[in-house]
Structure formats: structure tokens, C-alpha cells
């Protein structure tokens, strides 16, 4: 599955979000300004966060409830025993960063959608994200979506999430009764 890191450059410095320890990416991120911290948005996204934070001499903030002194608002996505996730909203830049609940890789979107809800969350998508109209939607798996498409893609993914489960469930009986195709060459 595609893993994506983000560097959010503010006037004070750079925040690394769920970074992967790839030297070229870390160098590029730190070239944007003084590193201020590493933010881990999903409890399972341990990745290389601790090692990067230690190497850069900055704090590691794991699924923070708030980020005082930063331009970011923290949005709770899910708080359960096995899934703790928050998202970041940067109002000045109209940037929404979501670690896992939304993605653009080939596993999450349905049909021609740019963005999809994580399959486990499709019945209970993070609807509180509907109130946001991002100019930039950054995800933990896949490429970001920018411009007007970001808000449209976000709202479509959230709006179609439950319907996608219904479509899948409705197709199960047909797939169960469908005869398997023969392998090439008979047999």
C-alpha cells in the first residue's frame, strides 16, 4: 500500500506528518525550514516517526488532542481501542490532512472517485469532515488532491461511503452463484 509523508511549512518552521524515513524526503522537508516536530495522526502509523523525531531533535506528538501554538486544528476521526486517529485542519491554507480514514490509492476509491473512505469505516465514515472545504486534501496513502477537486472529492467520498457497502453486499449473491471460468487451455 502506498505510504505518503507530508511536510507542512509554516512561518515558524516545518512540521513532519507521519513521515517515512526516506533520506531524500527528509532532506527536502528540512530544506523548507527548521523542523518543529513530528505529528503521528494514527496510532498504527508508527512508521519511522520516533527515529526521525529523535534524529531531528524535535518532539513526537502521537495522536494529539490539540496542538497549541501551531496553526493547526485537530479533528478527532476515531477513538477506539484498536483505532485512534485524528486529522489536521490548517484553516489559513485550507489544508486537510487525513492519515487513514480517507485515501486516494487504488484500494479506497470506488469507480472513478478520486478519494475513498477506508473499507472498515464505510458504514460509519468520518462525517464531521463534511464541514470542511479544503483547497488541499492530503492523505496517508496516495497522492493529494488540490484545487476545487479537493472539496468535491472529499464530499463525494463521504456521501457515497455507505452506498458502496450496499452495492458490494448486493453483488455477493451473484458472485456466489456465478460459475467459475475455465482456465486457458481447457482443464
Annotate each predicted stretch with a short phrase.
Residues 1-37:
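Pre-active-site segment of Zn-dependent metallo-hydrolases
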Residues 1-4, 23-28, 46-49, 82-85, ...:
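A generic local structural motif
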Residues 3, 51, 149-152:
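Generic recognition of short, well-ordered alpha-helical segments
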Residues 10-12, 35-38, 57-60, 115-118, ...:
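Short, low-complexity, polar/charged sequence segments that are solvent-exposed and flexible
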Residues 14-16, 50-186:
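Metallo-beta-lactamase
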Residues 22-68, 136:
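Active-site metal-binding motif and surrounding structural segment of the metallo-beta-lactamase
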Amino acid at each position: 500500500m502506498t505510504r505518503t509523508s507530508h511536510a507542512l511549512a509554516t512561518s515558524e518552521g516545518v512540521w513532519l506528518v507521519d513521515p517515512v524515513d526516506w533520506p531524500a524526503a527528509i532532506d527536502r522537508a528540512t530544506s523548507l525550514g527548521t523542523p518543529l516536530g513530528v505529528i503521528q495522526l494514527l496510532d498504527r502509523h508508527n512508521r519511522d516517526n520516533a527515529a526521525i523525531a529523535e534524529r531531528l531533535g524535535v518532539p513526537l506528538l502521537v495522536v494529539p488532542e490539540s496542538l497549541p501554538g501551531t496553526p493547526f486544528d485537530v479533528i478527532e476521526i476515531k477513538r477506539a481501542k484498536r483505532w485512534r486517529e485524528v486529522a489536521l485542519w490548517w484553516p489559513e491554507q485550507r489544508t486537510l490532512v487525513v492519515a487513514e480514514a480517507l485515501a486516494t490509492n487504488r484500494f479506497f476509491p470506488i469507480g472513478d472517485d478520486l478519494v475513498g473512505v477506508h473499507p472498515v469505516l464505510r458504514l460509519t465514515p468520518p462525517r464531521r469532515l463534511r464541514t470542511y472545504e479544503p483547497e488541499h486534501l492530503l492523505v496517508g496513502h496516495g497522492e493529494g488532491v488540490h484545487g476545487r477537486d479537493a472539496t468535491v472529492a472529499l464530499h463525494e467520498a463521504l456521501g457515497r461511503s455507505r452506498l458502496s457497502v450496499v452495492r458490494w453486499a448486493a453483488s455477493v449473491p451473484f458472485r456466489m452463484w456465478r460459475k467459475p471460468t475455465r482456465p486457458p487451455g481447457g482443464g
